[in-house]
Regions:
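S-adenosylmethionine
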Residues: 1-440
Length: 440
């Protein structure tokens, strides 16, 4: 039947990639939506996942290779080009899959999907050519930024940006780390059971977080420990945020940009009589925070409110809060390993506009902080304009605040009193944490 191709692993991967590349969908959301309705075996679902994430992550590299065998990309229908991309990904990077299986499946999809004989013939010719000879080698590209862009599938502007900020050697280490498979990580809510849970789940202690467990593969959320609220899904770097606030138990705390609530409930776990007021712009995200707090038995410690964080000073009076967390909206460049779409959806101009938003939020929330109170500022980006430069700009315009130097046992993540973690150091998300105090 003509639509049988949609029931195959590669056919479903094609449908997901069309949504991502042609409609701007997020790969994780589009993939989960398809797999939740799919009747594929677990093995085939794993193949779909590998093809989708791999093709998105390697898109620039794959396009460069295809340009050597396709004279005019614009003459191809978009779905044909996407089919070639996902097939080339398998030929180039999945060495356990026979080339003939990749080619035959792609030709079958083209035959059943297309209205014209030409698509089938073109797909067959291009893939047979690519599978019968060595692929072009991007290491031969002479211009450094272009070479790294093609080798590591990053936009040229981002390659240049990271080299300018970190130097070529460290930037290269960052580029290479983005293709190391992401670890699963959780925060343990009862530290006294850390060893027991680690042994039972086959996990290891986190190098960065004293309450974190990690493992290279597996599914923490399916365990009884998760269901009992002893584990919560949270990246190692994110686990470092709440402890910086030094919560004693009775404080009133503001989480200005709270969803999905991982840091909210982490802060709430330290409270006795105090509360965390968690803000977000969207009801469905506030619902996530409530669900998270409920699962961990912290619902009485968490209040939620629908509010733009840049308008906090208009709603809450001065001296409302002892401590504030601004986990600021950012470019998310530190998340590229887990969310490869990010690198294609940003550009150089974004950093200035994001910096303005981040400063607006800080300038608003600081008006509701009591004297002697602290603000922890965090992001999941490794770009200085969103991190160190935001802190510097805030201090220049707010003389009633000072920076508080943070500390951590891993001294290689400490930069001028801030925690500045890049993805290659511990194979985590890139992350930044700084702290400010309102002078008494």
């Amino acid at each position: 039947m003509a639509n049988d191709w949609k029931k195959t692993a590669r056919g479903q991967a094609l449908e997901v990639l069309e949504e991502v590349f042609q409609e701007g969908a997020y790969s994780n959301i589009a993939l989960n939506a398809h797999l939740s309705k799919s009747h594929l075996t677990d093995k085939d679902k794993a193949l779909v996942t590998e093809i989708v994430y791999g093709t998105v992550a390697r898109k620039i590299t794959l396009e460069w290779i295809l340009a050597h065998v396709i004279e005019d990309r614009d003459k191809l229908e978009a779905w044909v080009y996407d089919l070639l991309l996902l097939s080339l990904y398998q030929l180039a990077y999945l060495d356990k899959i026979p080339a003939h299986a990749v080619v035959n499946d792609a030709v079958s999809i083209a035959k059943n999907r297309g209205n014209k004989k030409g698509a089938e013939k073109l797909v067959n010719a291009v893939l047979r050519k690519l599978s019968s000879q060595p692929l072009p080698d991007p290491s031969k590209i002479k211009r450094v930024n272009k070479r790294y862009s093609v080798q590591y599938s990053l936009p040229v502007w981002l390659v240049k940006k990271l080299i300018d900020q970190y130097g070529e050697d460290r930037a290269l280490a960052i580029f290479q780390s983005l293709f190391v498979r992401n670890k699963a990580s959780v925060r343990v809510t009862d530290v006294s059971r850390m060893e027991e849970i680690a042994d039972a789940t086959g996990a290891e202690r986190s190098e960065l977080s004293p309450v974190g467990l990690v493992k290279s593969s597996g599914y923490f959320a399916g365990t009884e420990y998760f269901k009992e609220g002893l584990l919560t899904i949270q990246d190692e770097t994110s686990q470092l945020v709440a402890p910086t606030l030094g919560i004693q138990g009775e404080e009133e705390i503001l989480d200005a940009c709270a969803a999905p609530g991982g840091k909210t409930v982490h802060m709430a776990s330290y409270l006795t009589s105090g509360h965390v007021t968690a803000l977000d712009l969207y009801d469905h995200k506030l619902d996530l925070i409530k669900e998270n707090a409920q699962r961990l038995g912290l619902a009485d410690k968490v209040k939620t409110q629908k509010l733009d964080a840049s308008q906090v000073h208009r709603v809450f009076p001065a001296d409302s809060f002892d401590k504030i967390l601004v986990d600021a909206p950012c470019s998310g460049i530190g998340l590229i390993r887990r969310k490869p779409d990010i690198k294609y959806n940003k550009d150089l101009q974004d950093f200035a506009s994001l910096k303005a938003v981040q400063l607006d939020i800080l300038s608003s929330v600081c008006q509701t902080l009591r004297k002697g109170g602290i603000i922890t500022y965090s992001t999941c980006t490794i770009i200085a304009e969103e991190n160190q430069e935001v802190i510097q700009a805030f201090l220049e315009t707010h003389p009633d605040f000072e920076q508080v130097a943070l500390d951590h046992p891993c001294q290689n993540i400490m930069v001028n009193g801030c925690l500045a973690i890049t993805p290659e150091q511990y194979l985590t998300d890139g992350f930044f944490i700084a702290q400010l105090r309102k002078k008494a």
